[in-house]
Structure formats: structure tokens, C-alpha cells
């Protein structure tokens, strides 16, 4: 969200969307605005597939509860924390949550119920795949990130979820 502007969610496309003027909208549809000079630093998606986008400040972003749905997280600058939990992980790589702009040395992956020693860091067609070793579930895909750059310094323990 950017101060003084609107963000749409669900099936709503903008402030002039005809759905807003009818009785056809439903839970999960909406339009949200915040005041000028306001900055939101944390965002949590819902239980479906979400595209959660931060702003230029240090954001903490979490795709929301639900395994088997693909969330995409984008920090958009700042030293961001991308939160993951084993309960959201999946064995289906096509449904794994992804981080579209992870910056090694600046951003962090926040682990809710894991530690770095629980993980395997692997190559996946030029992306980095972060796996819980015990369950073989994928916690995150880091789009376009060389897996050899990722080490324990990229992870922190969080209590966000």
C-alpha cells in the first residue's frame, strides 16, 4: 500500500469497478486505502494464492496460511523479511511460495518453526529451493538467486505468524 492511494484485492480492479456499485461482490473482494504520509511495513496474505508486494521500507511479508497454494512475495526495496512456516510448505514444487526479489546480504528469510540446521539449500533450474530436510517440503523458491550464495546469515528466527 502506498499512502494516499488505493489497493484492490479479490476480483475488484479499481475504484470505478462496477462490482463495487452492485450486490455481486463477496468476502475477499475489496478496495483499501490509507492516508498520505502513511507507511505500512507488514503484510499478511490470505488462505488462497496471494501476490504480496511491499514498498521501499523494510517490510515483513508473509503469504498467509495454507499449504498447496502458491504465494508470491515481492519486497520492492528495503531490508525485507520474508516469513515461512512448515505448515505452509508443500512437496509440489509448482505450488511452492516464491520470493521474486530476494537480495542476498540485505533481505532475510524468517523461519517460524524451523532453524537453519533443518534446511537444505538446493539449485532448482537457476532458482534457489529451500527445503525442510525432514519432511522434504519446499518452504520457498528464491527466483533467480544462485543457491551457493545462500547461507545461515540469510535466515532469522521470527514469531510473526
Task: Place the predicted regions along the sequence by residue.
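Hydrophobic residues in beta-strands and at strand termini
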Residues: 1, 84, 111, 141-144
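Extracellular repeat-rich scaffold modules on cell surfaces
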Residues: 1-78
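Low-complexity acidic/polar repeat-biased segments
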Residues: 3-29, 37-41, 119-161
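Short, histidine-centered active-site or binding-site loop motifs used for metal coordination
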Residues: 44, 86, 134
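Acidic, glycine-rich calcium-binding repeat modules characteristic of RTX/beta-roll
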Residues: 49-117
